[in-house]
A protein has these predicted regions:
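Conserved, mostly hydrophobic/aromatic
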Residues: 60, 87, 109, 143, ...
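Conserved glycine-rich "GG(E/T)P / GGGxP" loop and the immediately following alpha-helix
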Residues: 98-133, 141, 146-157, 175-177
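Canonical Radical SAM [4Fe-4S] cluster-binding loop centered on the CxxxCxxC motif
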Residues: 50-83, 161, 171, 175-176
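Short loop/turn motifs at secondary-structure junctions
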Residues: 63, 100-103, 137, 162
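Glycine-rich anion/phosphate-binding loops
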Residues: 78-88, 147-153
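A short, N-terminal amphipathic alpha-helix
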Residues: 87-97
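Hydrophobic faces of well-ordered beta-strands that scaffold small-molecule active sites
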Residues: 51-55, 105-107, 139-145, 166-168
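Flexible, acidic/Gly-rich N-terminal and inter-domain linker regions that tether
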Residues: 1-52
Length: 177
């Protein structure tokens, strides 16, 4: 047990970046390399069971003390539509590389706080993603919510869009934490 503690009791990059930052090298990965990698990974996954998408919605109205995520703290909801527009532009870049319509078997909205976005704008985002993609029969669609801003309208809209899982990310029940 002490060897495990010794092995893992060190600072390291967050699991959300791969390859992890210490392994990045300037000019080691060309645009052509990236495109080939995207095409190969999406095509292989799409043919087997469909692709999994994670969409990062980085906005929050308040800072959680435990948060280590990439986020932007703001109460300005005018950021929603421009951000969604850019996500959909990026999605179109991926689609342009493919010769077949992707099948989405998993979609996760993470953050930040995805329910920072209005239900109407979340609908615009999800409709934009599925405009040029198929939803797998048993697709797993999930999102991270926050009890302070997830409304009944959020729940209704996301359910109607096919979302079947929500995570509220309780970190600890100790109020001092």
């Amino acid at each position: 047990m002490s060897s495990l503690v010794q092995k893992y009791n060190v600072a390291g990059p967050r699991y959300t970046s791969y390859p992890t930052v210490p392994y990045w090298e300037e000019n080691s990965f060309t645009k052509s390399d990236w495109e080939s990698s995207v095409i190969k990974s999406i095509k292989e996954s799409n043919q087997k069971e469909g692709i999994s998408l994670y969409i990062h919605l980085p906005f929050c109205e308040a800072m959680c003390t435990f948060c280590g995520c990439n986020k932007r703290i703001t109460v300005n909801h005018n950021v929603e539509l421009p951000y969604i527009s850019n996500v959909l532009k990026e999605w179109s870049l991926y689609l342009a590389l493919l010769d077949e319509t992707p099948i989405i078997s998993e979609l996760h909205l993470g953050g930040g706080t995805p329910t920072f976005f209005s239900p109407e704008n979340l609908q615009i985002l999800i409709d934009g993603i599925f405009k040029n993609a198929h939803k797998a029969k048993n697709a797993a669609l999930s999102y991270e919510g926050h009890p302070n801003n997830t409304t009944k309208e959020h729940l209704k809209t996301l359910f109607e869009l096919g979302f079947n899982r929500v995570s509220y990310g309780v970190q600890d029940y100790n109020l001092e934490v």
